[in-house]
Regions:
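Alpha-helical structural motif
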Residues: 7, 14, 44, 55, ...
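Surface-exposed loop-to-helix/strand elements on domain peripheries
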Residues: 1-3, 27-38
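Glycine-rich phosphate/cofactor-binding loops in nucleotide/flavin-utilizing enzymes
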Residues: 66-110
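Short, polar/charged, Gly/Pro-enriched helix-capping and turn/loop motifs at alpha-helix termini
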Residues: 18, 25, 62, 66-69, ...
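Generic structural signal for well-ordered, non-transmembrane alpha-helical segments
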Residues: 2-9, 42, 46-53, 81, ...
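Extended amphipathic alpha-helical segments enriched in small hydrophobics
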Residues: 1-25
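Charged, glycine-rich active-site and insertion segments that engage polyanionic ligands
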Residues: 33-68
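Charged/polar positions within long, soluble alpha-helices
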Residues: 13-16, 20, 53-61, 85-88, ...
C-alpha cells in the first residue's frame, strides 16, 4: 500500500510541477512555445503513462483475485485497460523519437 500511495504522490507532483512550468511561461511564448517546454511536456506524458500503469498494477495486486475477476466491486480490469491506453493511443515510442529529434536540434537549450 505504501508503494501505491508513493506512486500516486509522484504522479501528482509531476503534474503539479508541469502546471507550474506552464504558468511560468512568459505571455510572449503563448503563440510559440519554447522547444524545451515541448520536450518537458512530452516527457511528462511518457512518465505519467508509465507510472499510472504501475499504480493500477499495484492496486490489482493488493486487491488479489477480487481485483482480477470481471464482475466484482473491486474489479480493476477497466482501470488497467485505461491505464495502458495512455501509452498505446498516443504511442510513447513515437513521442520518445520526437523528443530525441528535438534534443538533437536544440543541443544545449535545456
Amino acid at each position: 500500500l505504501a508503494d501505491l500511495i508513493l506512486g500516486c504522490r509522484q504522479l501528482e507532483a509531476l503534474v503539479r510541477d508541469a502546471v507550474a512550468e506552464f504558468d511560468r511561461l512568459d505571455a510572449s511564448h503563448r503563440d510559440g512555445v519554447p522547444m524545451a517546454f515541448t520536450i518537458s511536456m512530452n516527457s511528462l506524458k511518457i512518465t505519467a503513462s508509465r507510472l499510472v500503469i504501475e499504480i493500477v498494477s499495484q492496486a490489482l495486486i493488493l486487491c488479489g483475485m477480487a481485483g482480477y475477476a470481471q464482475r466484482t466491486p473491486l474489479s480493476l480490469g477497466r482501470q488497467l485497460r485505461d491505464a495502458f491506453s495512455a501509452a498505446v493511443m498516443i504511442n510513447n515510442t513515437r513521442i520518445l523519437a520526437d523528443n530525441a529529434r528535438m534534443l538533437s536540434i536544440s543541443s544545449g537549450m535545456i
